[in-house]
From Swiss-Prot:
Chain intervals with Basic and acidic residues compositional bias: 1436-1456, 1540-1555
Organism from which the protein derives: Chaetomium thermophilum (strain DSM 1495 / CBS 144.50 / IMI 039719) (Thermochaetoides thermophila)
UniProt biased composition (Low complexity): 72-82
Family: Belongs to the cation transport ATPase (P-type) (TC 3.A.3) family. Type IV subfamily.
Name under which the protein is recorded: Phospholipid-transporting ATPase DNF1
Residue span of region Disordered: 1-85, 257-288, 1364-1456, 1489-1555
Pfam name, any one: PhoLip_ATPase_C
Residues at the site labelled Involved in the release of the transported lipid into the cytosolic leaflet: 554
EC number: 7.6.2.1
Catalytic activity annotation: ATP + H2O + phospholipidSide 1 = ADP + phosphate + phospholipidSide 2; a 1,2-diacyl-sn-glycero-3-phosphoethanolamine(out) + ATP + H2O = a 1,2-diacyl-sn-glycero-3-phosphoethanolamine(in) + ADP + phosphate + H(+); a 1,2-diacyl-sn-glycero-3-phosphocholine(out) + ATP + H2O = a 1,2-diacyl-sn-glycero-3-phosphocholine(in) + ADP + phosphate + H(+); a beta-D-glucosyl-(1<->1')-N-acylsphing-4-enine(out) + ATP + H2O = a beta-D-glucosyl-(1<->1')-N-acylsphing-4-enine(in) + ADP + phosphate + H(+)
Residues on Extracellular side: 156, 513-537, 1145-1146, 1222-1237, 1284-1302
């Protein structure tokens, strides 16, 4: 064997990835001596790993190794945690990999993972550490210590510590509950079962001797766990009724090993050529470093002899004990080097190299949804040398070494090699040859994936725990604090400064007075005597800190915790966000950031499973120049909506037509032949005319074309067919791509059913006849090729190559000079399909001769066995045969969006929120989805940033190319990307121009995220309405979120459903996980868990806005009320020589924040509503105040503080004047008893004033709020009467009857609140009348009943039936249970409301509409359709006129479906997208055909100005009418739009729309 590359390399790997523990780790050695790795060393290693990860983000787009380590090579340098590892199986470790005691030097992390922030042991110290990051808590702790010393006048130290203990305890309990769910999921995951080989020796790790420290931790965990389970059980018994009403809050993601039965007959037999299939979308490894012995160079020279030799790892000559068996064990017990057997539907517990599978050809299928969000199956291959391993005894005899690269987070790259010795057949008695086989990502099963459609797979563990790729992408669960909470520290510091000033004044004044007179004033002295003025002032200072401590209110933090907890409960209880299908409410997992949800400016969303259902449906096709299929897509609905058509009515009519067409199509198929696999409900390709052509009613030529097309769909794929028993039976297809499954399913429905694979071929039932088609070769799809091909021998002996792929790619490979008419017609049809938002593919074929195929196959086999540049060689060979194709036709597939996605995106856009899509899917798919969900539209220019790997060879060249593209695109906006522009961008919260969208791929993103280009890229994105980042890794997603969050200083929200979204969910200010059947890690790491994307609108626009406004108002009122109370005490010091005497009886001070004033302000924070939920959704522009952070500002804070000081003056001096002027006052002042009476005079009006002030600032005066105000005011009277009636009140005894019988007291009770609140009332009235906010106008309209229609629609939505799956798309634009609003446009909602009662939106709201610049009457200004009620009445949509010209709707009476309705939009699409290789254009495809070359890689869009853009045909207007621009509106005024008709510009004739 070759020597290892470096000693101790694994040790650095372990150090770089392990977390710091509370104690050092013990390494047990043979002699019993202990080696310890110090905590400082571990922390240093951890910091080094963090720095490397951060640097990797800018280099690779993901926290990967440095870019100078080439893919495919295994570096031998030991640079900390980046050293490779070598694993030995049934071979002794070489001496250089052992320590002096004979134990392995390499150390690997355990497979036990923890996403929870706390453990039972670390909870208390760690939680206290986080809580005392709050500066107020530190201050209160200091006060508690200060009160202990009697010289400072502390009354009761124990009582003073109660508030701090309460807030610390309440917060700790809340944090414990939040973290408990993560802990439970961690426990379930770590204890999930796996079949692990036991009874053999794994030499790569030493025996795990549990140390005393770990035993202690385990004992504590079991102890605290048992206590918690007891509490939980008791709580569940008490909460049985609540549990029956609401489903369990635990995500439906429990870890269970699936034990679905496996039918071996369903196993796919893959042809031998699939041994070298490369399924990953990354290029092949580059040539390895010659100094690194990853493979044997001798084997390369004998490639001709060894290319057909199958390796065998089993050494039958070595003796074995026979005790090895596969037994169930927990995930956490797996270690590197273990043999594991994975069964069908099992989740992968670690990163595993596949040695053998149940398939004789070594293929297995995995679902990677947890990693990249894709539910389609991917093929993984076992190593050729390990396929003979079947049983435990085979594993005992297997001798080999695995050389692996170090752990790195790139999900699409892996490089390693397996080495063993074997005798060759031509020299059976000679020495065993050293053999080697490369290991790639297609041989690796990653943790978090699921094994599908494979009976079992056997492999060895190469990475565990935090070394696995999924965990390296997950990051560490952050501790998030709300933005207001962070900003609150500044205000607390300000109040602390005011407190210090007050204390200094008191100390100086008391010291000076004491030095002058050495005697007290006539009033009572409370302070301590220091003996000298300086010492007296020093004591007075600290005594004043204690007395004035309420200026920094600890009660505020307690109240905020209560408010946030109740807000979280109401969010959880909102049935409008309850997803009944999976029994999933909205679960707040981080209770302390609900107000952050009300300030979100950027939302980052995953695509697959988040925006879409990832359910592909075959909708349309074009075959031999004839279009087929009927459908109504989201994109069509969006176009109709822009044209002013009532989408709901249009969709209803078209649905009826499609339903009738489906009945006719099914009847025709049944008449053609009895297809037992046709299920009516599964049929998505609705084309009666296709059925007629298939039956030959329109001639044999088209019949042959349709048959051959469907046969091509049934043969060109890599799907796995499963037959489900039933009557009739059902064929289910599992594929690498859901598109592929949709194509094969449609072929099945049309009578070409794939039955499975056997004997190296595909079995197909063709129109009732079973046929076998031998598969000679499969050329797999990847993102660079954008196509896949299958070479099949037909029954007549011909060899045909079927190729399907992107239309631009196929057109560039068609045979020159043929099918000119068909190519042109097909291009037009594909363009129409693309306008409808469908994903298009082209199907082509080529006939091969025997000699041609044999020659190509020889070259292919040589390329497939190459050890270097294998992918490049395979692509080069494939390129030679995928040429001179004959076009068969094209397909159009719809990726179904989740319910309500377009409306939710539209609402969020109206609110001023920018939505970016970060997806691991390919660019073409993301663009199609962008059109479907209204992120993109035909009026946009797509800015494409694309740097290809083949464009350069060095990092500097890549950076230069990326910089040039950024500079070119920034020039469109007259920008350079400098610091001044960034400063302006940080202050600008307006919506960007709606005419630009940006698309970028992951490889380009790697370079634009570098430090030198990041700022320019950010500023370019800021100018675009939509941004789509495609083919991005999880770490790149997090890097993009971090760039926007920190670069623009905005609030961000990330939403996703898979493990690949965890990093960005944790990076964003607010993380939202979508719960489903998979992706529990996203829910585990999120702050909120919801069931569907559409619930985001209610979470953000309703609860988020409410929470932010409530918290802002609560904090302001808290500071205000404590200012009154504290400054009243301060004013009293002026009359008692600043001796820091309490003017209030001490129980008043305790009761003030506990009972007198806290309940109303807490209810304000929990229940106050400026507008209802339905109005919040009907007018989403109200949310903009949160984006601009106008609810909580420093100006507001200081105004409330000044108001509090003013009212403290009134509250103190008015009662003081009344008391001094009464006969009860002594001639020389007040004695001790009179101090308490004056305090009562001041306290009662102050409490009434404070509660009245809170009521004034409250929008919603419901019975509970009014009751809390009344009870709070009454309670001070009640307490005073009860307490002073007892002798426990001491000097306050009998104060109530003495005070309450005085007329002056009742006069103070009336005059003081009136004078205090009068300025506030006057200012508020003036503001509402003369300078109303948007919400003030909307509230007036709501009070008038203008939103009654929206309220009724919300009630109907909550009580109405849920949308049925599979219902037509057009109907869904207005559906979705619990959406809380009607899904019509905001004016259409009130079509039945009288003209004078329809909502009139304020100008600021209209200005902030990102989709249309609407005036106060709803009239559209720029490039938008007018949808107000008046304009609907002025220009009603005339269906008859619309059908005449230029558009014709599909009719079921026509033999062929009409595409005229779609063709109207083609001319608007072509100027912006003609040069795009992601958007089909007939003109573009024609140029591709003529030049026979591939498309370019950049978008060069120059928008053309033509009359069609402003034609009435697209807006539901007369052809002679034109839209006015904003300048015309401003010039003529809004009154011009009230006329019945709008004339064209004088002197300019109307232009006809382009045809």
């Amino acid at each position: 064997m070759a020597p290892p590359q470096e000693e101790g390399g694994g040790n650095g790997t372990e150090l770089s990835m392990q977390r710091s523990r509370w104690a050092t780790r013990r390494l047990t050695v043979k002699s019993g001596a202990r080696k310890r790795l110090s905590l400082m060393t571990r922390a240093q290693a951890k910091n080094s790993a963090t720095e490397k990860r951060q640097s990797g983000v800018t280099d690779d787009g993901s926290p990967a190794a440095d870019g100078d380590q080439k893919e495919g090579s295994i570096s031998s340098s030991n640079n900390g945690g980046s050293a490779p590892r070598k694993l030995y199986f049934n071979l002794p470790l070489p001496p250089e990999l052992k320590d002096e005691e004979g134990h392995p030097i390499q150390q690997f992390p355990r497979n036990k993972i923890r996403t929870a922030k706390y453990t039972p042991l670390s909870f208390i110290p760690k939680n206290l550490w986080f809580q005392f990051h709050n500066i107020a808590n530190i201050f209160f702790l200091f006060l508690v210590i200060l009160v202990i010393f009697p010289i400072f006048g502390g009354v009761n130290p124990g009582l003073n510590s109660v508030p701090l203990i309460v807030i610390i305890t309440v917060t700790a309990i809340k944090d414990a509950i939040e973290d408990y769910r993560r802990t439970i999921l961690d426990i379930e995951l770590n204890n999930a079962p796996v079949h692990r080989l036991q009874g053999w020796e794994n030499v790569n790790v030493e025996k795990d001797n549990v140390s005393l420290w770990r035993r202690f931790k385990k004992a504590n965990s079991r102890f605290f766990g048992s206590i918690w389970h007891l509490i939980e059980r008791l709580w569940k018994e008490d909460a049985q009724s609540m549990r029956q009403r609401f489903a369990s809050a635990d995500p439906r993601m429990s870890i269970e090993t699936r034990t679905a039965p496996w039918d071996p007959s369903h196993r796919r037999s893959v042809a031998s050529h699939t041994e070298e299939i490369q399924m990953t979308p990354v290029p092949s490894p580059v040539p390895h470093d010659p100094d690194v012995p990853t493979v044997s160079s001798a084997i390369e020279n004998e490639a001709t002899l060894l290319q057909n030799l199958k390796g065998d790892l089993i050494n039958h000559e070595i003796p074995v004990s026979g005790k090895a068996r596969f037994h169930k064990d927990a995930w956490k017990n797996l270690v590197v080097g273990d043999f594991v057997r994975i069964y069908n539907d099992d989740e992968l517990p670690a990163d595993i190299i596949i040695l053998a599978t149940s398939d004789p050809d070594g293929a297995c299928y995995v679902e990677t949804k947890n990693l990249d969000g894709e539910t389609n199956l991917k093929v993984r291959q076992a190593l050729r040398c390990g396929r003979t391993l079947k049983h435990a005894r085979d594993c005992e005899r297997a001798q080999f070494v695995i050389e692996s690269e170090p752990p790195q987070p790139n999900l699409y790259k892996y490089n390693g090699a397996i080495r063993w010795k074997q005798r060759v057949p031509w020299d059976p008695h000679g020495e065993p040859r050293e053999m080697s086989e490369p290991i790639g990502i297609d041989n690796l099963l990653l943790r978090g994936c699921h094994l599908r459609n494979t009976e079992w797979a056997l492999g060895v563990v190469v990475f565990t725990g935090h070394d696995t790729k999924i965990m390296m992408n997950a990051g560490i669960t952050p501790s998030k604090r709300a933005r207001i909470a962070r900003e609150l520290n500044f205000n607390v510091i300000c109040n602390f400064g005011i407190l210090l000033i007050m204390c200094l004044i008191a100390a100086i004044a008391n010291g000076i007075a004491w030095g002058k007179t050495d005697a007290s004033l006539a009033w009572f002295e409370y302070g301590s005597i220091g003996g000298t003025p300086a010492l007296t002032g020093f004591i007075t200072f600290w005594a004043a800190v204690i007395v004035f401590q309420n200026l920094v209110p600890i009660s505020l933090y307690i109240s905020l915790e209560i408010v946030r907890t109740l807000q979280a409960f109401f969010i959880y209880s909102d049935v409008g966000m309850y997803y009944e299908k999976i029994d999933q409410p909205c679960i707040p997992k981080s209770w302390n950031i609900s107000d952050d949800v009300g300030q979100i400016e950027y939302i980052f969303s995953d695509k697959t499973g988040t925006l879409t259902q990832n359910v592909m449906e075959f909708k349309k096709a074009t075959i031999n120049g004839q279009p087929y299929g009927e459908a109504y897509t989201e994109a069509q609905a969006g176009m109709d909506r822009r044209r002013g058509i009532n989408v709901e009515e249009e969709a209803k009519v078209i649905r009826e037509e499609i339903a009738a067409a489906k009945v006719r199509a099914i009847r025709g198929l049944r008449e053609l032949h009895d297809n037992p696999y046709l299920h009516d409900e599964d049929m998505t390709f609705i084309a009666p005319d296709f059925v007629e052509d298939l039956a030959g009613k329109n001639g044999p030529e088209q019949q042959q074309a349709t048959e051959h097309f469907m046969l091509a769909l049934a043969l060109c794929h890599t799907v796995v067919a499963e037959k489900q028993p039933g009557d009739p039976p059902k064929m289910i297809f599992k594929a690498q791509s859901p598109d592929e499954a949709a194509l094969v399913a449609t072929a099945r429905d049309m009578g070409f059913t794939v039955l499975g694979m056997s004997d190296g071929g595909i079995n197909v039932n063709v129109m009732g006849k079973d046929m076998h088609f031998p598969v000679l070769s499969i050329i797999e799809f990847n993102s660079s090729r954008k196509r896949m091909s299958t070479i099949v021998r037909m029954p007549d002996g011909r060899i045909l190559l079927f190729c399907k792929g992107a239309d631009s790619v196929i057109y560039s490979r068609l045979k020159k000079g043929e099918q000119a008419d068909m190519r042109r017609e097909t291009a037009q049809h594909l363009e129409m399909f693309a306008v409808e938002g469908l994903r298009t593919l082209c199907i082509a074929e080529r006939e091969l001769s025997e000699e041609e195929y044999r020659e190509w196959r020889r070259e292919h086999d040589l390329a497939a066995t190459a050890l270097e540049n294998r992918e490049e060689k395979l692509e080069e060979v494939a390129d030679k045969i995928e040429r001179d194709l004959t076009l068969l036709g094209g397909t159009a597939i719809e990726d179904r969006l989740q319910d309500g996605v377009p409306d939710t995106i539209a609402l969020l856009a109206d609110a001023g929120i920018k939505l970016w899509v970060l997806t691991g899917d390919k660019v073409e798919t993301a663009i199609n989805i962008g059109f479907s969900c209204n992120l993109l539209n035909n009026d946009m220019d797509l800015l494409r940033l694309q740097v290809n790997e083949s464009d350069a060879s060095t990092e500097d060249d890549y950076l230069q190319l990326a910089e040039e593209q950024l500079k070119t695109n920034l020039e469109r906006f007259n920008m350079t990307g400098d610091d001044e522009e960034l400063k302006r961008a940080r202050k600008d919260h307006n919506a960007p121009s709606p005419t630009y969208a940006l698309v970028i791929d992951g490889f380009t993103l790697r370079w634009v995220l570098s430090d030198s280009l990041k700022q320019k890229f950010l500023l370019l994105c800021k100018q675009c309405k939509s941004v789509l980042c495609c083919r991005v890794s999880p770490a790149q997603k997090a890097a993009v979120v971090s760039m926007v969050k920190n670069g623009l200083d905005v609030m961000t929200l990330s939403i996703g459903d898979g493990a690949n979204d965890v990093a960005m969910i944790q990076e964003a200010d607010v993380g939202v996980g979508i719960a489903g059947e998979e992706g529990r890690q996203a829910v585990m790491s999120s702050d909120f868990a919801i069931g569907q994307f559409r619930f985001l609108q209610r979470l953000v626009l309703v609860h988020g806005r409410w929470s932010y406004r409530r918290l802002a108002e609560t904090i302001s009122n808290f500071f205000y009320k404590n200012m009154i109370w504290t400054w009243s005490i301060f004013w009293y010091q002026c009359y008692c020589n600043f001796d820091i005497a309490y003017i209030f009886e001490y129980t008043y001070i305790l009761m003030f924040n506990l009972f007198f004033t806290s309940v109303p302000v807490i209810l304000m924070g929990v229940l106050d509503q400026d507008v209802s939920d339905t109005v919040s959704l009907a007018v989403p522009q109200l949310y903009r105040r949160g984006i601009e952070r106008k609810e909580w500002t420093q100006t507001k804070f200081w105004l409330y503080m000044i108001d509090g000081v003013y009212q403290s003056v009134m509250s103190f001096f008015i009662p003081f004047i009344f008391v001094v002027l009464t006969p009860t006052a002594a001639g020389n002042g007040l004695d001790v008893s009179e101090r308490t009476r004056l305090g009562a005079y001041i306290a009662h009006p102050a409490v009434i004033t404070i509660n009245g002030y809170i009521l004034i600032n409250t929008y919603r005066w419901d019975w509970l709020m009014l009751l809390s105000i009344v009870l709070s005011d009454v309670f001070i009277f009640f307490w005073t009467g009860v307490y002073t009636a007892t002798t426990y009140s001491a000097g306050f005894y009998q104060a109530a009857p003495q005070v309450y019988q005085e007329l002056t007291f009742w006069m103070c009770l009336i005059v003081t609140p009136a004078l205090c609140l009068l300025p506030r009332l006057v200012v508020k009235c003036i503001q509402k009348q003369r300078f109303p906010y948007d919400v003030d106008i909307i509230r007036e309209q709501a009070n008038r009943g203008d939103f009654a229609a929206a309220d009724a629609a919300a009630v109907a939505a909550l009580g109405g039936p849920e949308r049925v799956e599979g219902e037509s798309l057009g109907s869904l634009s207005s559906s979705g249970k619990g959406s809380g609003r009607s899904k019509k446009s905001k004016h259409q909602q009130y079509a039945s409301v009288d003209e004078d009662r329809r909502p009139i939106y304020p100008p600021s709201i209209a200005t902030h509409n990102t989709r249309a610049q609407n005036g106060s009457d709803g009239t559209t200004y720029i490039m938008q359709s007018r949808t107000s009620t008046e304009l609907q009445q002025e220009m009603p949509f005339d269906r008859d006129r619309e059908e005449e010209t230029p558009a014709v709707r599909p009719s079921i009476e026509r033999t062929r479906p009409s595409y005229d309705r779609i063709r109207r939009s083609i001319d608007r699409v072509r100027p912006s997208f003609e040069a795009s290789n992601d958007f089909t254009s007939a003109a573009r495809l024609s140029r591709i055909e003529s030049t026979h070359s591939s498309l370019g890689h950049t978008y060069s869009h120059q928008r053309e100005s033509y009359a069609g853009e402003s034609s009435g045909a697209q807006q539901g207007q007369e052809p002679g009418q034109r839209r006015f621009n904003l300048a015309t509106v401003r010039k003529r005024g809004l009154s011009a739009f009230s006329k019945k008709s709008i004339d064209t510009t004088e002197g300019e004739p109307p232009r006809e729309p382009p045809m």
